[in-house]
Curated annotation (Swiss-Prot):
Homodimers. Associates with alpha-tubulin. This is Inactive protein-arginine deiminase type-6. Structural constituent of cytoplasmic lattices, which plays a key role in early embryonic development. Cytoplasmic lattices consist in fibrous structures found in the cytoplasm of oocytes and preimplantation embryos. They are required to store maternal proteins critical for embryonic development, such as ribosomal proteins and proteins that control epigenetic reprogramming of the preimplantation embryo, and prevent their degradation or activation. In contrast to other members of the family, does not show protein-arginine deiminase activity due to its inability to bind Ca(2+). Transmembrane segments: none annotated. GO terms for cellular component: cortical granule; cytoplasm; cytoplasmic lattice; intermediate filament cytoskeleton; nucleus. Phosphorylation at Ser-10, possibly by RSK-type kinases, and Ser-446 creates binding sites for 14-3-3 proteins.
Amino acid sequence: MVSVEGRAMSFQSIIHLSLDSPVHAVCVLGTEICLDLSGCAPQKCQCFTIHGSGRVLIDVANTVISEKEDATIWWPLSDPTYATVKMTSPSPSVDADKVSVTYYGPNEDAPVGTAVLYLTGIEVSLEVDIYRNGQVEMSSDKQAKKKWIWGPSGWGAILLVNCNPADVGQQLEDKKTKKVIFSEEITNLSQMTLNVQGPSCILKKYRLVLHTSKEESKKARVYWPQKDNSSTFELVLGPDQHAYTLALLGNHLKETFYVEAIAFPSAEFSGLISYSVSLVEESQDPSIPETVLYKDTVVFRVAPCVFIPCTQVPLEVYLCRELQLQGFVDTVTKLSEKSNSQVASVYEDPNRLGRWLQDEMAFCYTQAPHKTTSLILDTPQAADLDEFPMKYSLSPGIGYMIQDTEDHKVASMDSIGNLMVSPPVKVQGKEYPLGRVLIGSSFYPSAEGRAMSKTLRDFLYAQQVQAPVELYSDWLMTGHVDEFMCFIPTDDKNEGKKGFLLLLASPSACYKLFREKQKEGYGDALLFDELRADQLLSNGREAKTIDQLLADESLKKQNEYVEKCIHLNRDILKTELGLVEQDIIEIPQLFCLEKLTNIPSDQQPKRSFARPYFPDLLRMIVMGKNLGIPKPFGPQIKGTCCLEEKICCLLEPLGFKCTFINDFDCYLTEVGDICACANIRRVPFAFKWWKMVP
């Protein structure tokens, strides 16, 4: 490059000094210039002194020299000698800083030559919240900004996905380069600051290019606020735009950009996005290409979607508006009041089956140091939906995202309902501070086997922070793991315990209970005695005595099969979650094998599937120590349901309050049980996901 004075200015990383005339160079803050000290040394030179001006740091033989110091170093002339030079701040004018090297012969008092390097320091940097404290700070290590490191001692900036419900189904038009962003939305975006400083006569000869790769530009958007102090922001980087040129007009440029992700990590997207600013010199000769003189890079990681176990404190209960059955809403509302939770109604969605609220949606959250956002992740089973009423039911500040599914059959396992999250666990020395995602699967290849689609499975694995565990659930009609297991919170974590218990469905425990009651003389007590005949008929059930249930060999064989399936999962859970038998409570529950209902004949498999014989006790609403449990309508012993009594005996000594909810009118129908009629938003983990090491 040529300066305004016509002197040759160098951006080279190695500078060769001259005794005949000064050398001029530009040094970008954060970079080093290597000086060849021996190349121009006079013959018979035996030593040299070197010093620099106030903004220059010099390193010779691992000795750092500042303005106040001179270093006299003896060095054989035959050995190449180098010094590294760095600038500590930008220069106020061209050639405002310098390095002088004076050479001496055998007589140290008589210098035999002097070489001078004039320096012009400029700053070109991109800065982000690299230290994850919510503040944009200048990094002392330029190379560190190019990496993203997990763990408590790690570093690297974080991006949040735009989960604004208003943007669901909407795409920013390719040609639309302006967007109004309100002040409350700004807090969701991550800041990226561009700093450029130096003499204007130097800077104006270059241009700055802010850029990313074409692939990464599809995963995030970068906005630049307009100068009119309005809420209008210019889209400078995003889908179909991976580079943006800024003009350098003055001696100081400081601009803040706002960045949002538009996709969570997935099989095709690692979650890492890098942005660079390049200082580009345009050639005066048309035959010579432009030259990139310097590039600074920062790396963001898109915050993962974190799923929340039912052991976390509840905040808000969402209920299907069309399911306001007699007593149901009142009971759930009372439960919510006991746990200081709000109740919200959800708009009816005529395009989706009644189970959609819980089976196809999950409350989760995403988090950066500056912001935590709760959101609904929706995996709609109905294809080609044009509208999503759920997004209009959410409380302010709650996000909404759609994760497409592939299998849209009625009995599909390809939905977020086929997922549960364990509380935090430690397994063989490995900690999972955010718990582990539990996925229902078919476990082995089968012509009729069902499983979560690869797309959804890969999405769950790609989040990295809740290492998935696959369970065998294809034996269930719904295929969902929450039909045979549930976690409840305990207060004993500080006493060396895990802080939770695992409840597992147990047909054998149910048969044991019924045999006990039979021996006590209650064999004629009726299951479903409290229900009307039309209720039983609509659900394919009939009232039976304990004697009849115990004499039903077919039902017994069906439950022996179910017991084997649950036992397989029990072993997996003990291994993968580090559980022991004392962490597990067996809940009496019977199942029966049936064909799928309400599905087209071409989707009907040959085999039968298990479904709860009476309302599933495991499908409870967990609200701290308050449990909303489906009323099982078990045999009445002295006016008390023996199943309810058993549950209370198991759980109430541990401090739980059991409320049994009559939801039989939606049991086994398209609606399902109470868990499918409600979904709960919970408190996010206190632990920050970036402090773990996957």
